[in-house]
Amino acid sequence: RGDKDIFTVHDILKARGEI
């Protein structure tokens, strides 16, 4: 389904410093 996708997006946002 899309659990890993959500984690990937969260990781990207964290790397960008948005979260």
Curated annotation (Swiss-Prot):
Its EC number is 4.2.1.20. It catalyses: (1S,2R)-1-C-(indol-3-yl)glycerol 3-phosphate + L-serine = D-glyceraldehyde 3-phosphate + L-tryptophan + H2O. GO terms for molecular function: tryptophan synthase activity. Signal peptide: none annotated. Pathway: Amino-acid biosynthesis; L-tryptophan biosynthesis; L-tryptophan from chorismate: step 5/5. It is an enzyme of class 4 (lyase). Its cofactor is pyridoxal 5'-phosphate. Keywords: Amino-acid biosynthesis, Aromatic amino acid biosynthesis, Lyase, Pyridoxal phosphate, Tryptophan biosynthesis. The beta subunit is responsible for the synthesis of L-tryptophan from indole and L-serine. Belongs to the TrpB family. This is Tryptophan synthase beta chain.
